[in-house]
């Protein structure tokens, strides 16, 4: 997590923007079921009547309703309405909506009225009146259908009985009023809306137009909010992609730069296949985690918590269904995590293994064919492939079974809500629109848990990848830059080994012991010895591919550890034991040693390296293409181009690590003669297996088991060094030895 925080810090503003947009998107998604509920409850069932109390009433309606209110409510209700005078501007304005207002004494709801209190009183009175009608009809044998009959009532007949009702004792209505007091406010508001439609119909209101207007307005609100939600989702996706790709780019760049600073010690710790996987696949996993995490990690909790809050606002009585669903989903997520997480953690290790086997097989294809071991390599690859496939198959099956289980839970919860909600609707304790919204909120809660499950499944693999990337980035370099590097200077000085010893990291014994010699400018110092004597190891200490564990190496009298690595290596022309070319052209490969080299310098280096002949025969000369790794040129040609690349630097020190082994004797001799002139002012170090390559060197150092056993010229060593003479006798004729 520390790694992610570090890389997300530059994108803090975008991350904050994503979180805010996710809140906005969640609020849009949570608002839509509410609007759908309003359309069903108010727009369809109540005909678009959404007023808590009618805006305009017939005075007779006020007289009728106040009979079914207590004194306090009646006072509040009457004070809330003011008479509309005939012929007034107010009446003219209201007549546009209430066409019959001029034919009756009307009252209008005051702007400063307490709408909530008036609405409560109105709803209770409407419910009490309906209860009274029902009870009165039962007593007189003239039953009133309160479900549909109320909507067809003739208000003039109701107003006609007002005087009779006013003569009745107040106690006559007390039972109906008490029933209304005890009833849920939702029932009162529903009955109130039914009576509002009657009063509006009496006033000449176009109820169909009112209903259509309400539905259209709510529909447009839904459309607008849906578009806002889509816009927020698009912006979140854009920002999340920008953040994740930016983090991945920086992380990949940092890993690459870190690997470039590795010495051979670090490369011994990390395999090439592993470093490739960490730079590509592991970074991609982290990128996916950031991209999906920004969208799901923040969105899922907001939706889950918001869905629960909005659902409880619709109905508390159904909350046990949500609790049951959440418990089942939590159990499912826990089971999935315990089953899938260990497998996800092993995926990256198995990917590493497959890459390693693939790389070894491809790079060693000729050897595999030479020993007819194709079947063995196929078996190795099949095992690595099968292990990865089996683990991938298991994790994919776990993930694929998650969705059907979630859908089953979702459908069962929907059925349960419809069953329980249906009974609540029948008992008038819940509205159809509220049940529909409740189902939507429950689906959103379940989908939130599905997203959380996906996150928990994705996080372990991504965190393993992040740890693997961090392992590379936090690897302590064995070769460090000096805090205050000194400058080497322009003079071509000598190279000196002063009692140098070297031991590989976990080795028990030194590979090199007490090595001391001086290589002077204008002279060739050669190294020879049996295989494993430490020749290449010694050479690798000069450009600081490894650091000495004892003694010191000096260049121009300065300890190379006090020089910056760039300055040190800029002063060395290095030809490795295994020639390596890069994809491009011959010219680009030669200029790899010196980017600003002109044509004459390139041609001079090629001429000295004895590469001019075969380069000139190519159709495009120095612009001829080189395949990856130099696979389209021979071993000798590749080695000569590698030598030319080092020579073009015109460095004060040249290192040839067994760089003439692929050359024939004739080319070897010509190259050495040309090299003597080309490097006349430089320190030349040659590691060789052939005595003929180094017999003219001013100084030959013989190594055996990491120690110097002989030092001198060819003739001197033949007399004084048995090890050198043994090597020489195995390669040279008696005449040459003489």
Regions found by a protein language model. Name each.
Residues 28-44, 216, 225-272, 276, ...:
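Juxtamembrane helix-loop junctions of ABC transporter transmembrane domains
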Residues 44-51, 58-65, 154-155, 159-162, ...:
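Short intracellular "coupling" helices and adjacent cytoplasmic loop segments at the cytosolic face
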Residues 1-32, 36-223, 228, 232, ...:
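Membrane-integrated ABC transporters
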Residues 10, 141, 165, 169, ...:
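An intracellular "coupling" helix at the cytosolic face of ABC transporter transmembrane type-1 domains
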Residues 11, 23-31, 223-234, 286-289, ...:
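Hydrophobic alpha-helical transmembrane bundles that constitute the permease/transmembrane domains
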């Amino acid at each position: 997590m520390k790694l992610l925080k570090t890389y997300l810090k530059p994108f803090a503003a975008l991350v904050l923007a994503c979180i805010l947009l996710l809140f906005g998107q969640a609020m849009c998604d949570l608002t839509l079921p509410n609007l759908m509920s309003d359309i069903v409850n108010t727009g369809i069932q109540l005909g678009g009547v959404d007023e808590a109390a009618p805006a305009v009433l017939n005075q007779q309606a006020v007289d009728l309703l106040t009979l079914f209110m207590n004194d306090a409510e009646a006072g509040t209700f009457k004070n809330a309405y003011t008479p509309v005078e005939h012929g007034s501007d107010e009446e003219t304005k209201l007549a546009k909506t209430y066409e019959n207002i001029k034919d009756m004494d009307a009252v209008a709801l005051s702007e400063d009225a307490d709408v909530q209190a008036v609405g409560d009183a109105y709803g209770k009175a409407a419910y009490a009146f309906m209860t009274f009608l029902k009870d009165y009809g039962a007593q007189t044998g003239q039953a009133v259908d309160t479900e549909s009959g109320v909507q067809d009532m003739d208000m003039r007949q109701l107003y006609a009985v007002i005087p009779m009702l006013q003569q009745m004792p107040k106690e006559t209505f007390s039972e109906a009023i008490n029933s209304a007091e005890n009833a849920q406010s939702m029932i009162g508001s529903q009955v109130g809306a039914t009576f509002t439609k009657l009063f509006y119909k009496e006033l000449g209101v176009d109820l169909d137009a009112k209903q259509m207007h309400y539905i259209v307005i709510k529909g447009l609100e839904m459309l607008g909010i849906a578009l806002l939600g889509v816009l927020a989702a698009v912006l979140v996706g854009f920002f999340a992609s920008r953040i994740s790709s930016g983090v991945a780019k920086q992380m990949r760049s940092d890993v690459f730069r870190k690997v470039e600073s590795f010495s051979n010690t670090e490369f011994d710790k990390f395999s090439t296949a592993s470093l490739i996987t960490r730079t590509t696949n592991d970074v991609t996993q982290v990128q996916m985690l950031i991209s999906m995490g920004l969208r799901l990690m923040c969105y899922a909790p907001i939706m889950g918590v918001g869905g629960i809050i909005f659902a409880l606002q619709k109905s508390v009585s159904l909350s046990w269904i949500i609790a049951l669903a959440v418990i089942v989903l939590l159990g499912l997520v826990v089971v999935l995590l315990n089953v899938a997480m260990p497998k996800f953690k092993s995926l990256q290790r198995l990917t590493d293994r497959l890459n390693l086997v693939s790389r070894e097989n491809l790079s060693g294809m000729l050897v595999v064919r030479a020993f007819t071991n194709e079947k063995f390599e196929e078996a190795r690859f099949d095992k690595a492939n099968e292990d990865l496939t089996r683990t991938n198959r298991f994790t994919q099956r776990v993930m694929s079974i998650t969705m059907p289980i979630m859908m089953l839970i979702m459908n069962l919860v929907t059925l349960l809500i419809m069953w329980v909600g249906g009974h609540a609707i029948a008992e008038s304790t819940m509205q159809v629109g509220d049940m529909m919204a409740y189902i939507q909120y429950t689906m959103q809660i379940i989908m939130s848990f599905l997203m959380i499950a996906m996150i928990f499944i994705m996080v372990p693999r991504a965190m393993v990848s992040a740890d693997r990337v961090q392992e590379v980035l936090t690897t302590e370099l064995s070769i460090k830059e000096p805090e205050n590097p000194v400058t080497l200077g322009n003079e071509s000085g000598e190279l000196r080994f002063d009692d140098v010893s070297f031991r590989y990291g976990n080795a028990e014994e030194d590979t090199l012991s007490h090595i001391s010699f001086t290589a002077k400018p204008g002279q060739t110092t050669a190294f020879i010895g049996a295989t494993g004597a430490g020749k290449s190891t010694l050479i690798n200490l000069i450009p600081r591919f490894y650091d000495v564990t004892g003694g010191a190496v000096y260049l121009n009298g300065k300890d190379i550890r006090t020089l910056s690595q760039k300055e040190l290596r800029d002063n060395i022309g290095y030809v490795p034991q295994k020639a390596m070319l890069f994809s491009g052209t011959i010219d680009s490969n030669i200029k790899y040693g010196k980017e600003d080299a002109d044509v004459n310098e390139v041609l001079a280096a090629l001429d000295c390296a004895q590469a001019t002949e075969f380069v000139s025969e190519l159709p495009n000369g120095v612009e001829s293409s080189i395949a990856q790794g130099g696979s389209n040129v021979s071993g000798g040609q590749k080695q000569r181009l590698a030598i030319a690349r080092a020579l073009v630097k015109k460095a004060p020190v040249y290192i040839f690590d067994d760089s003439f082994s692929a050359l024939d004797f004739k080319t070897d001799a010509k190259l050495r003669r040309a090299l003597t002139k080309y490097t006349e002012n430089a320190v030349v170090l040659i590691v060789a297996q052939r005595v003929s390559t180094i017999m003219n060197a001013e100084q030959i150092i013989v190594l055996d088991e990491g120690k110097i056993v002989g030092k001198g010229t060819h003739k001197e060593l033949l007399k004084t060094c048995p090890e050198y003479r043994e090597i020489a006798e195995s390669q040279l004729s008696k005449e040459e030895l003489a």
